[in-house]
UniProtKB/Swiss-Prot annotation:
The gene is Kcna6. It comes from Rattus norvegicus. Keywords: Cell membrane, Ion channel, Ion transport, Lipoprotein, Membrane, Palmitate, Phosphoprotein, Potassium, Potassium channel, Potassium transport, Transmembrane, Transmembrane helix, Transport, Voltage-gated channel. One of its GO terms (cellular component) is potassium channel complex. The N-terminus may be important in determining the rate of inactivation of the channel while the tail may play a role in modulation of channel activity and/or targeting of the channel to specific subcellular compartments. SMART domains: BTB. This is Potassium voltage-gated channel subfamily A member 6. The modification Phosphoserine is found at S3, S222, S512. It is a multi-pass membrane protein. It is found in: Cell membrane. It catalyses: K(+)(in) = K(+)(out). Residues 411-422, 423-430 dip into the membrane without crossing it. SUPFAM superfamilies: POZ domain, Voltage-gated potassium channels. It comes from the Eukaryota. A motif (PDZ-binding) lies at residues 527-529.
Length: 530
């Protein structure tokens, strides 16, 4: 039976070896972690009661890590049991030890959550390169610059920037965030309500009745179709239908200022005033103008307000340049083109709903999850594309002999393949033959399997960002100092290193491993003092 070497405690300032000779802490570190015959010796590592045994030369492959550096791991040594004790996660240490044994291969155990395993990587100080490689293998976004948010150098600009950009920074900032959310919701409600038939009918009916223009039944049908397209996007009465009639006069004078006195237009104007004011204030106070326009949320703010000004400018131009229509088709085509362009521009207003993500942590987590899962989503779309081509072709040839087939061509069958693989099944197109039904069954099964494959990866990314966000909120309540190496100031515990004798003996040796404040914390403290 192998006898284990042990150390006995002596007077403060000295350590006795296995033969009883006196050693100081420095001599003990050299004997324990030095080269020569000692490098083939084995040491015992206790992880929360689970003992591991490995060779010193295995750990010395990575001397810049916690276990590979004798000076760093000595603070965890228990001389009574002749082992290193770590009160850490036990399942994670299997992968940590395998990292040393395999020469740098880091694989997370399936029963260990991602955030816990990353904490273990940081604790054992495997290095930034190992952490970055692990995050890339897990499909997570690379760290760097996300947690350290720059602030303006001027005190006034800093206060304004915190007021409009960080709602959690103060009470007034939360009030401004609440006002912004209410304005966004009002704008979205107005965007939906103005398309109701009763509101669209008021503007259309008023212009037709007031214009005094009589149209033939044939021309009335065509112009009513144009009016429906017009009212589907424009403000009530913004482009009157009387102006499009043959032989009629412009109805702008008849309507007077209906466009500028419409309740929807007035509420929309108030919302745009707030959006513009908020955007200009944030732009003037931002620390970097170039980074301001690279932010996707600021681009959404611009997209949310420019349709209003384009529509307003078009309306003003038409009010000043509208001429009586003499029945020419060129004027009608120009009007139709203007209506189509404005309809698309007005559709952009729906993107205002994404402004809510600035004030919602949940939407931000969802956006980061989708960004981190772009590779899996791309594979999903690629597999769906292959399935659509395959099954649409198969169902077309399976139904080719049926005279009542609903699949006249392969492109027409694309729609059926998409709704079948996504398990929607509208029922507007369906196979009738036995072969077509078999193809449809296989298409549905393939769609379920294809969609289910990337779901675990997406869920894992969502859990990672969710736990990281909650941890940041909890850590933000405390003063946190990070350091590259552990602090030697230990209190008395049950292990040997916690004993006053051994701590006193190795204090001078470990004085070089004192922690230094993290750069981000130092900058934050300077800003607080200012």
């Amino acid at each position: 039976m192998r006898s284990e070497k042990s150390l006995t405690l002596a007077a403060p300032g000295e350590v006795r070896g296995p033969e009883g000779e006196q050693q100081d802490a420095g001599e003990f570190q050299e004997a324990e972690g030095g080269g020569g015959c000692c490098s083939s010796e084995r040491l015992v590592i206790n992880i929360s009661g689970l003992r591991y045994e490995t060779q010193l030369r295995t750990l010395s492959l990575f001397p810049d890590t916690l276990l590979g550096d004798p000076g760093r791991r000595v603070r965890f040594f228990d001389p009574l049991r002749n082992e290193y004790f770590f009160d850490r996660n036990r399942p994670s240490f299997d992968a940590i030890l395998y990292y040393y044994q395999s020469g740098g291969r880091l694989r997370r155990p399936v029963n260990v959550p991602l955030d816990i395993f990353m904490e273990e990587i940081r604790f054992y100080q495997l290095g930034d390169e190992a952490l970055a490689a692990f995050r890339e293998d897990e499909g997570c976004l690379p760290e760097g610059g996300e947690d350290e948010k720059p602030l303006p150098s001027q005190p006034f600009q800093r206060q304004v920037w915190l007021l409009f950009e960080y709602p959690e920074s103060s009470g007034p900032a939360r009030g401004i965030a609440i006002v912004s959310v209410l304005v966004i919701l009002i704008s979205i409600v107005i965007f939906c309500l103005e398309t109701l038939p009763q509101f669209r009918a008021d503007g259309r009916g008023g212009s037709n009745e007031g214009s005094g223009t009589r149209m033939s039944p044939a021309s009335r049908g065509s112009h009513e179709e144009e009016d429906e397209d017009e009212d589907s996007y424009a403000f009530p009465g913004s482009i009157p239908s009387g102006g499009l009639g043959t032989g009629g006069t412009s109805s702008f004078s008849t309507l007077g200022g209906s466009f500028f006195t419409d309740p929807f237009f007035l509420v929309e104007t108030l919302c745009i005033v707030w959006f513009t004011f908020e955007l200009l204030v944030r732009f003037s106070a931002c620390p970097s103008k170039a980074a301001f326009f690279r932010n996707i949320m600021n681009i959404i703010d611009l997209v949310a307000i420019f349709p209003y000004f384009i529509t307003l400018g078009t309306e003003l131009v038409q009010r000043h340049e509208q001429q009586p229509v003499s029945g020419g088709s060129g004027q009608n085509r120009q009007q139709a083109m203007s209506l189509a362009i404005l309809r698309v521009i007005r559709l952009v207003r729906v993107f205002r709903i994404f402004k809510l993500s600035r004030h919602s942590k949940g939407l931000q987590i969802l956006g980061k999850t989708l960004q981190a899962s772009m590779r899996e989503l791309g594979l999903l779309i690629f597999f769906l594309f292959i399935g659509v081509i395959l099954f649409s072709s198969a169902v077309y040839f399976a139904e080719a002999d049926d005279v009542d087939s609903l699949f006249p061509s392969i492109p027409d069958a694309f729609w059926w393949a998409v709704v079948t693989m996504t398990t929607v099944g509208y029922g507007d197109m369906y196979p009738m033959t036995v072969g077509g039904k078999i193809v449809g069954s296989l298409c549905a099964i393939a769609g379920v399997l294809t969609i289910a494959l990337p779901v675990p990866v997406i869920v894992s990314n969502f859990n990672y960002f969710y736990h990281r966000e909650t941890e940041q909120e909890e850590q933000g309540q405390y003063t946190h100092v990070t350091c590259g190496q552990p602090t030697p100031d230990l209190k008395a515990t049950d292990n040997g290193l916690g004993k006053p004798d051994f701590a006193e003996a190795s204090r001078e040796r470990r004085s070089s491993y004192l922690p230094t404040p993290h750069r981000a914390y130092a900058e934050k403290r300077m800003l607080t003092e200012v």
